[in-house]
């Protein structure tokens, strides 16, 4: 059973780094500063994280997962396509609310690790809520469908991150969401994927 004190101290440290990164600037808080803000000791910090970067990564992944979780998933593959623009728009709006935070975690030393986590998370959601779920569960090469989902998730993540980091010159969220959603829907509906799946099932 998890010690509630450990759970609480981890939450306090995550809240401390999240608050620090929510403000403009590039300075990274020290372990001493974070411990003071969270009200925990340095040994407690090291019980959870090896360094500040690993704490930043954990906080970023937690916030990204919460953002994805706030978007209501569709109930069937048939409803997925018309819902994609709304879902993508909601994600972009959510990123903008904490633009300073995401800019800092997506341009610093944690950028790759955070993006890899987001790609894996998005790929899993595609395999769960999109028409890929039906193809993945049918007889055939599951690994191929999973790789395709990862490919789509990586491309989507790249476009979203690029849009966010454009700063004041970025296009309106609605316009960007429309384009990203169209590419995502086209990819999932790809006849090439259907052909690959059909061939692998033989």
Task: Annotate each PLM feature.
Residues 1-3:
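Short Lys/Arg-rich basic patches
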Residues 5, 9, 80-83, 87, ...:
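Conserved acidic
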Residues 7-18, 22, 27-31, 39, ...:
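An amphipathic alpha-helix adjacent to DNA-recognition modules
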Residues 9, 56-63, 84, 110, ...:
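Hydrophobic/aromatic residues within well-ordered alpha-helical segments
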Residues 35:
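The alpha-helix within a helix-turn-helix
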Residues 71-101, 111:
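Hydrophobic alpha-helical connector segments
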Residues 92-119, 129-134:
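Amphipathic alpha-helical segments used for helix-helix packing
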Residues 107, 129-202:
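Hydrophobic/aromatic-rich alpha-helical bundle segments in the mid-to-C-terminal region
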């Amino acid at each position: 059973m998890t010690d509630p004190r450990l759970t609480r101290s981890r939450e306090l440290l995550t809240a401390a780094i999240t608050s620090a990164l929510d403000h403009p600037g590039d300075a990274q808080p020290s372990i001493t500063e974070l411990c003071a803000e969270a009200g925990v000791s340095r040994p407690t910090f090291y019980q959870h994280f090896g360094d500040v970067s690993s704490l930043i990564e954990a906080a970023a992944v937690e916030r990204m997962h919460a953002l994805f979780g706030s978007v209501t998933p569709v109930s069937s593959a048939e409803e997925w396509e018309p819902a994609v623009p709304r879902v993508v728009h909601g994600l972009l709006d959510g990123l903008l609310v904490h633009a300073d935070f995401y800019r800092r975690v997506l341009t610093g030393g944690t950028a790759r690790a955070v993006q890899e986590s987001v790609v894996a998370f998005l790929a899993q959601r595609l395999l769960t809520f999109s028409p890929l779920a039906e193809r993945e569960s049918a007889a055939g090469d599951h690994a191929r469908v999973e790789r395709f989902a990862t490919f789509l998730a990586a491309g989507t993540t790249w476009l979203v991150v690029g849009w966010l980091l454009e700063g004041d010159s970025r296009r309106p969220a609605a316009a960007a969401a429309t384009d990203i959603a169209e590419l995502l829907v086209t990819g999932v509906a790809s006849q090439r994927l259907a052909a690959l799946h059909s061939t692998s099932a033989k």
